[in-house]
Amino acid sequence: AKANFLTEIFDEKFIRVPTSGAFLGGQNYDRRHTMSQGQVMAFKGDIIPPDDWIYFNCECKFYKDFKFHLLFNESKVLDGWIDETLATANENDLNIIFMKFNNIGEYVAYQRREKFKVKNFISYSRGWNFTSHESFWNDYNISKIRDRSKGINL
């Protein structure tokens, strides 16, 4: 679903990774040194972006529930998703987490350093922000994601 959404927004083809990002994460990080750029992109994160989006790294999470009150203290779940995202990241990647929770809504977590423009957000620990899907998707952020992912304005 998120790959189709990104395909519509950016008018470029995105596809869901058929296997887990763990193929290149954690202790498997060094595998990327013997792989082509295209091979790395096929196993990094949960979405395979267009070929020229070499700095795009995202995770997609779909869960029944999320305990929002933990965002004000410490969310082991969100911390785990951040760790998972960063485990497959290369230097200068645009790291982003798309989340959907049953009967609650869709949300986006992103690194604060990216300076996306959103109306409302929660400043989470470890340099990440948490916002709603509706607040996140605007023309400025769409252009910024496209440019950053292609290496423009790094």
Where are these regions (language model features)?
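Catalytic phosphate/metal-binding cores of nucleic-acid and nucleotide-processing enzymes, i.e., regions
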Residues: A1-L154
